[in-house]
Each structure stands twice: as C-alpha cells, then as structure tokens.
Design a protein with these regions (language model features):
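The feature marks long extracellular or luminal low-complexity segments
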Residues: 1-199
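Extracellular zinc-dependent metalloprotease catalytic-domain scaffold
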Residues: 198-319, 324-483
Length: 483
C-alpha cells in the first residue's frame, strides 16, 4: 500500500514550490515498510511542475518528490507505486496580493575587504499580507552610508519575490545600503543593510634561504600579495622561539637562523635548489608549524628545483605551492579540519571536499548539474599515497584551475577561482571572493576538449614532513604527520 506521509493540503504562491515537499510511505501486504520501491510523482491538474519525480523509498519506506511548483487555483499531484496507488496531494496556488513588507533574505551584517564587493550580495524579499512572495516588483538599492558603491542597483523580483543587488563594494568602517520599492504602506520600506569594510590584515613574510635574483624574489612577493588579496583577515599572532637547528631538522633541511619573534601571520621559507633534475618534481611545499586552535599554518617552506624554474611559468608554480603552505590540501585531513570525505589514503575512489563555502561556490561556477560523483571532487588520479591525491581539485573536472594537480600548457591561464578562495574560508580564514579570477566549469570543459598543449603533472608537490603544533603562546604541543 502507499499512503500520504507529508505535504498534502498546502497553499503557495502561484509559480512557487509548496513549502513541504510531498512524500509517501510504502508498505507491503504484511504492513512491513518497503525500502527501494520506485515511486512516480506526476502533476494531475493545475498546470504546475515537479522535479525529482521518480525517487525510491528509503529505509523507512518513504519517498519524497524533489519539489512541486503550483499553478493558479486548485492543483493536484499523484504518486504511484507499481501495483498500487495512486494517492493524491492537493494544493492551492494563490495569486499574491499587494506588497506589504520587505524582508532581508541574504547579505546583511557582513564584513568585507575594502574596495571589493561583499561575498554575498544583499537580497530582499517582497511579500503580501499573507506572507506570499510578490513577483515583478522593482526594487532599488542605494548606498546610504560609508561611501561604497553598487552594481545592478535596480532589480525586479522573480517568482520567489526576491531581488538581489548585483554587488555591493564597501569602504573602511561602517557601510549601509538601502532597498526600497515605490509602493506606499509597506513595512520596512526602505529596508537597511549594514556591512563593515576591513583593511587587509593577513601578512605573508617570505624568507629566502638561498640566493635568488631580484626578478625571482619579485615572483614570491607577487604571489604573496595575490594571496593577501584573497585572505584578508588577521589570524592570531604567535610568539615563537625556535632554534635554527630545529628548523633545519624539521622544516628547511639547511642552515636556518633561530626564529625568535611574534609571527603575524605566517613565515614562509623559500629555497631554490636541486631536487631531481629537469621535468620531474617542479616544487614541494607545505606547513611546518600550525596553530593548535584552527590549525592555520604559522611557519612553512617552499622548495623549487633550479633545473625547472626557467622551463615552466615560475609565477604559477610559486602561487600554487604557496597555497599549499597556507593550508590548501595540507590541513584538510582527518587529523586537522576533516574537510575531505572518502580520501584515497583510506581506500576511497571519489574523495570530495565538504566545506559549506566551497560547496556553494562549486554550484556558483556551474556545479549544480554535476553527477559524476559527490561534490566537490578532489583529485583521485594518481598512485595511492602520492602527492597529488586528496590535496588538489580534480583535474578531470576543473581543467586549468590553479589548484588542480597539473600545470597547464605554456600560455594557458591558470585562474585561481572563487572555489579555491571559498575553500580557504572553510579553513577558517576571512576571504574575499571578489578577488578571485573568472572561472567556470563550462570553460574548464571546453579547454580540456580543445587540448592546446601538454599538461605537466605537479608530481609529489606536497611535503611529507611532521607538522609541529604550537599553542597561542608559541609553546610546542605535539608533532603530527599530515596523513
């Protein structure tokens, strides 16, 4: 038998989904719950539509439609299981009345980097006296304080009743933005958003341990400045006093001065030396010491093979490896932030990054229709335990994105995408989405299809060093192997 489990007798604005998704429960002839039964949902009347029309029942015998969007007036939906049913759901599609209230739906109370758009564009919902969304209302957004600016200042509400400003760029200190409609008698009209503009306060200190030309040093400084535009918020300063021989043994592998200072926010040693000759390992990098609270790195090291620095785009490799020192792929694991599910080191075949900011950014760049596995796909291409797996975006999906495990062909851009920036937000950093390079999965797929030269694998570019953990006072806590 099949019975209604949830979602009958609802009301919703025409052209919008009902608030509770219809669900049925299936039992066999002995009243036992049936798992794995195929259920078909179909619109019976009213002119609405459904998504996820063919679910299967779960362990509780329940199957739920993806969504049911209603038309005007009376609507019915039927659910059928082979050999039984159908059962019917009812809903009323309401024509929204006049606007009665403006409601904040997104983007209030943010902090962002001055001179850049906030990560979440402010959005407002227009509703009638019953709380139903009102479509086709013109909403005007205007800066009311702080001296910032907006794009897309006049927007029209959709069927959801929501209008979203194109972007809101903030200046230092307090910023305010108003949203209004021309109708009279509307509560919260205008509606006010607040935001705080912050100056950049994340500092990367590059410490060369080998001789390098001014042009090579400039590449490191440029890469640091790039990351400092993307990670802008301060992290706790850490006072350290680490002997040079300890740094040599556990971090740099060479003579290193004693580090006796308060680190704000990370010190990165840079070394140009022979690794393994031309065309193999281009560089290796990773954190040497991390904070006990939050796990953000405080000291790290980057090695680059002198046999390769002139043969590949050095700036791209340095920017990539610096990302690993800061934490990309190196503090994701279960010993730290536990951001990767199904890593290849534990026998997984579809490792994926599960940070909420990255998941949202993946959809933003075109990942909503991704069906080849779980989101967000992490590299699984290579020998288990190798330096590429579980620590990069998956090359087969992301193509030329900077933080995949392959270096693109000469002349092919390697954009540092909003996905990578968002992943750093999941690591606990304050990040600036608007500083990311333009990137989409469609672009990545087209680039992969077009070819355009030989991609070079960034083989074993993650350092496998014990990572020292230090507390807020710089006291050593423990050594941890990265994975």
């Amino acid at each position: 038998s099949v019975v209604v489990q949830a979602g009958d007798s609802q009301r919703a604005a025409q052209g919008t989904p009902v608030p509770v998704r219809p669900a049925v429960q299936v039992r066999d002839q002995y009243s036992n719950l049936v798992a794995g039964a195929a259920v078909a949902f179909a619109v019976d009347s009213g002119g609405g539509s459904v998504t996820g029309a063919n679910p299967t029942t779960n362990g509780s015998g329940i199957a739920t439609v993806g969504s049911w969007t209603v038309g005007t007036g009376n609507n019915t939906l039927i659910a059928t299981v082979s050999g039984t049913g159908p059962v019917k759901f009812h809903a009323t599609g309401v024509v929204p009345g006049a606007p009665k209230q403006l409601i904040v739906t997104a983007g209030n109370g943010q902090t962002g980097l001055i001179g850049y758009a906030l990560n979440v564009p402010p959005a407002v919902e227009v509703v009638d006296s019953e709380g139903f969304p009102v479509p086709n209302k013109l909403v005007t957004f205007a800066v009311t304080g702080g001296g910032g600016s907006v794009t897309g200042d006049t927007m029209t509400t959709g069927t959801s009743g929501i209008a979203t400003v194109g972007s809101w760029t903030v200046q230092l200190g307090a910023n305010t933005l108003g949203a209004s409609i021309p109708d009279a008698g509307v509560t919260n009209n205008p509606l006010s958003f607040t935001a705080t503009g912050a100056a950049p306060d994340y500092d990367i200190s590059i410490r060369p341990l080998t001789t390098m030309s001014p042009s090579r040093r400039a590449v490191f400084d440029s890469a640091a400045a790039h990351w400092e535009r993307l990670i802008y918020g301060d992290v706790p300063d850490i006072p350290v006093n680490i002997p040079g021989d300890t740094l040599k043994k556990y971090c740099t592998g060479r003579t290193t001065p004693t580090l006796n200072e308060t680190i704000d926010d990370i010190v990165i040693y840079a070394i140009l030396d022979s690794i393994d000759g031309p065309g193999k390992v281009l560089g290796r990098a990773g954190p040497c010491y991390i904070r006990s609270s939050g796990f953000q790195p405080v000291i790290g090291v980057m090695f680059f093979d002198t046999a390769d620095v002139a043969s590949f785009p050095f700036d791209v490799v340095v920017t990539h490896e610096m990302g690993h020192v800061i934490g990309f792929g190196t503090i994701w694991g279960g010993r730290f932030l536990n951001l990767v599910v199904g890593p290849t080191t534990q026998g997984g075949t579809d490792p994926h990054f599960v940070g909420p900011q990255a998941l949202a950014a993946f959809d933003r760049i075109g990942g909503t229709g991704y069906t080849a596995g779980a989101k967000v796909p992490v590299e699984n291409c290579c020998t288990p335990g190798g330096g590429s797996n579980d620590a990069h975006w998956r090359e087969a999906v992301f193509g030329d994105e900077l933080m995949t495990s392959f270096l693109g062909a000469t002349g092919v851009p390697k954009p540092l995408s909003v996905l990578t920036v968002a992943s750093m937000g999941d690591e606990g950093y304050q990040v600036n989405y608007a500083g990311a390079d333009a990137f989409s999965l469609t672009f990545a797929a087209l680039r992969a299809q077009a070819g355009g030269g030989q991609a070079v694998p960034l083989v074993d570019d993650i350092l496998r060093l014990p990572i020292g953990v230090v507390d807020a006072r710089g006291r050593f806590v423990q050594w941890v192997m990265p994975r």
